Amino acid sequence: MTSPLRFEADMSMIEGEKLSPIKIPPSRLSTNTTSPDILAKHPHGLSAKQDARRNTVHNETPKGLTATPLTKKAEPLYSVNKRIPLTSPRATNQPNLDSLKKSKTKLDARLYELKSSSRHGSPSNKENMHNSGKSTQASQLSSDVNSSISHKSPFESSPSKIDTPIKQINSSFAKNVKSSPPKSSPSKADKRSIEDDSVIENSRKIAKVITNANESEVSHHKSDDEHSIQIDQVFNKEDLVGRFSSGASPAKLHEPTVIDEDSDGDIYNNEVNTSHTMTSKMRGNESTQLSRIIKITDEVDYVTPQRYTEPVAKSPEINQQHRIKENVINNTESKETISPLKNHMLSVNSDQKENHVSSNRMEDENSDGFNELEDEPTINFLLSPNSKPVFSLDHIKKVQDDHFKEVANLEEVINNKNQEILKFSEELSATNNKFLIYDQKIKELKQDKKKLIANENLLLIQLKHNERELASMTKALRIKENTVTQLESRLSKSKSKYESTANELESVIEEGNTLREQIKRLEKSVEDKSISQKEYESQIKILNDEIKEKDTEISSLTDANIDYNIKVENLLSEKEELLTETGRLGRENNGLEEINSKQQELLEELDKLENLAKDKIMTLENTLDSKTQEIKQVMTEKNELLTKIDNLTEENKNSGRELQQYKDDVEELTNKLNNYNNARSDLDDKINRLQEGLNKSNEANESLQNKVSGLLEEIERLNQHVSESETQMDLLKSINTEKDEIISGDTKKMGELVQKVNKQKQVIADYEKDYSKALEDIKSLQSKGENTSLNDEIEDLKKQVSQGQAKTNARIQEVAEQLYFEYSKKHELKVNQVRASFKKQIDNLHFEKKSQARDIDSLQKKLEIVNMEKNQLLRLIDEYQSGSDHNPKKKLSPKKSGIKKPSRY
């Protein structure tokens, strides 16, 4: 019986693999680089030189133009792909057993055909020739199957092939019935020859059936071989008629040679183990392939002793003298049995005694008696013709009757043996059917195992894919964190810049306040001067020079009035500009509402907006730099203003000196006061108007102070916004830490699941080991022939194996479903969380962008206001300088001043 396949578990997929969601496993894709790997596998030494010199052997066609060591694919020296000839010394390590088996089977078939044609040349044996040809073809097929048994399962043969031995046995029984000898026949010699041929043919057919019933069972069951050997011994030892009638030698008729075409290496082990008698040992020696070939060549072929031109027939024995000597030595004890005429009664008594001897003793003594009876005609032929013995008819009839009885007994024995063979063949067919059923179950189990392995591979691929996705997500999160940190750094820089600009604005505002205080001081000094002038006017009423001073004061006051009118116009223009800006801001607010409505559309263009945001940030930074430069310019201009103020103080001192000179002039102008008495009333009116203008300018200063306070409030609001953004950043960091904790928990769960899978695989391996042990037990039990009593145990073992396999399959399926469900949920949750966090971050970025744009606009407005104030101050200073440079006695024209010329007295 053929042995079932070993159920080996393929556990190499997971051994040594450590799964982690963050670390991406190295890719197994082969790179296109050629030089390093090929140089590492480059053959070197004498073997490389010898292989390079053999241009015709093992030469692979290169893919490029020429075959060089770099372009040739490196292979080991003793690879299976290289077909080494049998004569080379390298073939010692790799024997080509398949080709030897095929050639051996072909030789066996051919030699058997030659032998059968040489022995059975009569037309009555054509059927045997036909059957032998079929058997040789079957043997070739069986040998091919046995040669490829390492690649196929042992029970892949169809049931129709297993039923063929039973059909052959039935056909052989039919031929035995047809070829059984009749009781009465006209010619006794023909009758004996027919009986001998039929007995030999039947024995050979039965032996052929036994040997070819299951060709693969020879190497696994010693009991079947022993049984077939015993049957062959019975047929060969009891074949008396054939030995008497045929002219062959006793050495040739001692045992019929039955050729088994599927004789492999297992036959030698079986024949060495079957050591029953000397005949079995001789058969073991004769069953080798070389001994068979030598025997057949001795029987069929011709020998050329000296030359190859004239063949000489080989005689088995040239001289017959040794037979004469043996017969003379053997006949010293029983001389009377040679001739039935001298001592007929003794021969009869000896025959009767021999009939009563036990079967074992007769089997031992038959060979010597047969040799004597077979040698007798040759001895008589060699002696003189007058000395030939004459046999009586009674003796011949008696011998014939004995032979017929023996033939009948042998036929009964053959029928009994054939019945036993039928029983055994039925049992074999039943066992083969059982084995086929078991094989189908094994195939189903293997298919289930393959499916499980495929499912495991799919699960591993899914796990690796999920790990890669997790790694990519972690990388994306890290990239986003880096961007957030960059934005934080930019925000901190912008905050510092805002603080610096705010400080600079405060300094500028303080400087403006100082300038305003200085202006107030100057105005107070002017008022003091006017008071002093009034005092001087009260004291010097008579002088006409005092009128001139009053005229100069009137001209200065008219200039100041003109300046205040210009300031009022500027303030009105600024008011209109503020109104226009408020309208524009309202429109922008409406635009912002529309933008909020279109926020969903803008989410699709997040990537573009991020790039635009980066560009805008760069532009904002550039604008901030430009603004800082402008602020620096303002500072320089401020310094210039300070220098100008110093100059003005010096000019004030000079003006004081000039006042003393004016006092001197007042004494001279006392005479002209009478002319200007009428103009005093007009001057008083003008002074009132100027006071009203001063009040308006004070109100404008208060409005400017309110604006400055509003700017300070906006700066505070910006600081609050920055603090809120910092809190949001802290929240994002906490969310990231929570996500890291979730990922670590997932990794732990992954490790636990991997451990569970490994445990399940160990359980599967244990079940497979139990299954293999059960199969081995089944094989051993079937080899012993105890199928009837142990089928229940086999079925129980199969049930246990099937139940264990079903449990493992169900458990693996449950684990796979749980893994898939958990990972799908986690993946969806993580993706949703990441999306929400990214949306929040993007919204925050948009809000920060808008707030920064607003802050920049407000700062630009503040800078414009500061520039306007600076320009106004510069105008005032220039006008003051221009007024101081002119002659104080010079009067303003009425067209420019808009004041009526006073009437003189």
From Swiss-Prot:
<keyword id="KW-0175">Coiled coil</keyword>
<feature type="compositionally biased region" description="Low complexity">
    <location>
        <begin position="178"/>
        <end position="187"/>
    </location>
</feature>
<keyword id="KW-0072">Autophagy</keyword>
<comment type="function">
    <text>Required for cytoplasm to vacuole transport (Cvt) vesicle formation and efficient autophagy. Plays a role in ATG protein retrieval from the pre-autophagosomal structure (PAS) and is especially required for autophagy-dependent cycling of ATG9. Also plays a role in regulation of filamentous growth.</text>
</comment>
<feature type="compositionally biased region" description="Polar residues">
    <location>
        <begin position="119"/>
        <end position="174"/>
    </location>
</feature>
<dbReference type="GO" id="GO:0015031">
    <property type="term" value="P:protein transport"/>
</dbReference>
<keyword id="KW-0813">Transport</keyword>
<feature type="compositionally biased region" description="Basic residues">
    <location>
        <begin position="888"/>
        <end position="905"/>
    </location>
</feature>
<keyword id="KW-0472">Membrane</keyword>
<feature type="coiled-coil region">
    <location>
        <begin position="400"/>
        <end position="810"/>
    </location>
</feature>
<feature type="compositionally biased region" description="Basic and acidic residues">
    <location>
        <begin position="99"/>
        <end position="113"/>
    </location>
</feature>
<dbReference type="Pfam" id="PF12709">
    <property type="entry name" value="Fungal_TACC"/>
</dbReference>
<dbReference type="GO" id="GO:0016020">
    <property type="term" value="C:membrane"/>
</dbReference>
<comment type="similarity">
    <text>Belongs to the ATG23 family.</text>
</comment>
<dbReference type="GO" id="GO:0005737">
    <property type="term" value="C:cytoplasm"/>
</dbReference>
<dbReference type="GO" id="GO:0006914">
    <property type="term" value="P:autophagy"/>
</dbReference>
<feature type="region of interest" description="Disordered">
    <location>
        <begin position="879"/>
        <end position="905"/>
    </location>
</feature>
<keyword id="KW-0963">Cytoplasm</keyword>
<feature type="coiled-coil region">
    <location>
        <begin position="844"/>
        <end position="882"/>
    </location>
</feature>
<keyword id="KW-0653">Protein transport</keyword>
<dbReference type="InterPro" id="IPR024312">
    <property type="entry name" value="TACC_fungi"/>
</dbReference>
<protein>
    <recommendedName>
        <fullName>Autophagy-related protein 23</fullName>
    </recommendedName>
</protein>
<feature type="region of interest" description="Disordered">
    <location>
        <begin position="18"/>
        <end position="200"/>
    </location>
</feature>
